[in-house]
Design a protein with these regions (language model features):
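Short intrinsically disordered, low-complexity coil segments enriched in acidic
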Residues: 1-8, 131, 137
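Serine-esterase "nucleophile elbow" of acetyl-processing enzymes
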Residues: 4, 11-63, 69-74, 87-91, ...
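Alpha-helical cap/lid subdomain in secreted, periplasmic
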Residues: 54, 78-219
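Intrinsically disordered, low-complexity regulatory regions of eukaryotic regulatory proteins
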Residues: 7-10, 103
Length: 219
């Protein structure tokens, strides 16, 4: 609760917190670079613009390389399940969580199927439910990896199997959403990876995803 006080007015405003927990496509990585889109371009920022003045605040928690439950031995702190409970506590009370992870889980050194990645997502959903049964969850299956993402000049951490696994996430996540009574959105239905790196959203992709997410949040 935020208290605002001036010489003529004192009132309380209760802001609803929406935690967006994801990877580089929530962080807003610019395709083919190590730079970040500005807040006015990122899908999280676009949502915040539309919800401004309506009692909502967006908490951006996107991290490049983040997975659901897998440890990245090359980069520390990427295991989503290791951090999510802390974030839920530090930002409490959280009204909603928008959860979009799974792309990095498709990397070759995890060797995970879509079904196993789905179990990782279940773990995260269970963590949210444990923190607060009243938190409303929007589970988003990520965009698909582009064909040839493994080719020289792109991302060698993926291969052909990675692309196939990414294509299977939509159906798996939808079942998880039904099991745990989550809202569901398939990012692959509204956006696709950029031609620049075959992996990340471009400006148009961020715009399309923001519009789709807003549609679910407003329902």
């Amino acid at each position: 609760i935020m208290k605002i006080q001036n010489s003529s007015d004192r009132r309380e405003i209760t802001m609803k917190e929406i935690l967006c927990f994801g990877d580089s496509n929530t962080y807003g990585l610019i395709p083919g670079t190590k730079k970040r889109y500005d807040r006015d371009t990122r899908w999280t920022g676009l949502i915040e613009q539309q919800l401004y003045g309506k009692g909502y605040r967006i908490i951006e928690e996107g991290l490049c390389g983040r997975t659901t439950v897998f440890e990245d031995e090359l980069r520390e702190g990427r295991k989503g399940a290791a951090l999510l409970p802390t974030l839920l506590e530090s930002h409490a009370p959280v009204d909603r969580v928008v959860l979009m992870l799974g792309t990095n889980d498709c990397k070759t050194f995890y060797n995970a199927s879509a079904e196993v990645i789905g179990l990782g997502v279940e773990r995260l959903v269970e963590q949210i439910r444990k923190a607060d049964q009243n938190i409303r969850i929007l589970l988003i299956s990520p965009i698909q990896l582009g064909e040839g993402v493994w080719e020289p000049g792109y991302d060698p951490e993926f291969n052909e199997k990675s692309v196939e696994v990414s294509k299977g996430l939509k159906a798996v996540y939808q079942k998880v959403a039904e099991k745990y009574d989550c809202d569901f959105l398939a990012a692959s239905d509204v956006a696709e990876p950029s031609k620049e790196d075959r992996e990340h959203l471009n400006k148009e992709g961020h715009k399309k995803l923001a519009e789709a997410v807003l549609g679910v949040l407003a329902a």
